[in-house]
Amino acid sequence: MTTIVVLICASALFVQLAFSQCLGRDPVIGFGGAYGSGWGGYDAISPYDGLGYGVPYSAGFIGLSPSNLAASCGGALAVNSLSPTTPTGLTVASENTIEGNLGIFGQLPFLGAVATDGAFSTGGIGAVLYGCGDGAIGIVSEAPIVAPASIGYGQWPVNAGYKGIGPCGCGGLY
């Protein structure tokens, strides 16, 4: 029985190690004393501000800052492959007959080669232009993520934004 419990706990630990990502935290703004004034950690025992997970002088976002949510920030997710065979890649194929001028552009998820196969008319030309950009490998199409504006924690008695603490949120501007 002990072996089964240890095996289940070890499996849960390995799953958490494989699928977890640290997004960090930003400071709580507005309080004095142990909570600081928005320039440090949000508790008295931890001055952690998540360097690399948000600006030290945060713009008032409690929790995750927008820079934490982009796929290109916050460190890399490690990918390990222990397959006995090499991946063969990704194939994008079209069985259509295409006549006239054709321009195809887009993003493929891995570095690789481009090949054309099929019958080309002798009166036209066929060319493949291939470039590997800035080294970003993957299906990446990002736009800036804008978080809702936050009033933040104010002074007592209003305390949590312009509406105070109540059933309708804490007064963020959505």
UniProtKB/Swiss-Prot annotation:
Q: Which InterPro entries match?
A: Chorion
Keyword Transmembrane (UniProt):
no
Q: Which GO terms describe its cellular component?
A: egg chorion
Q: Which UniProt keywords apply?
A: Repeat, Signal
Q: Does the keyword Repeat apply?
A: yes
Q: Name one GO molecular function term.
A: structural constituent of egg chorion
Q: Where is the signal peptide?
A: 1-20
- Outline the segment boundaries, as ranges, of region: Left arm: 21-71
Where are the residues of the annotated region Central domain? 72-142
Q: Where is this region: Right arm?
A: 143-174
Q: Which GO terms describe its biological process?
A: chorion-containing eggshell formation
The record's annotation in Pfam families points to: Chorion_1 (PF01723)
Would you identify the family this protein belongs to, as annotated?
Belongs to the chorion protein family.
What does this protein's UniProt record list under function? This protein is one of many from the eggshell of the silk moth.
> Which protein, by its recorded name, is this?
Chorion class CB protein M5H4
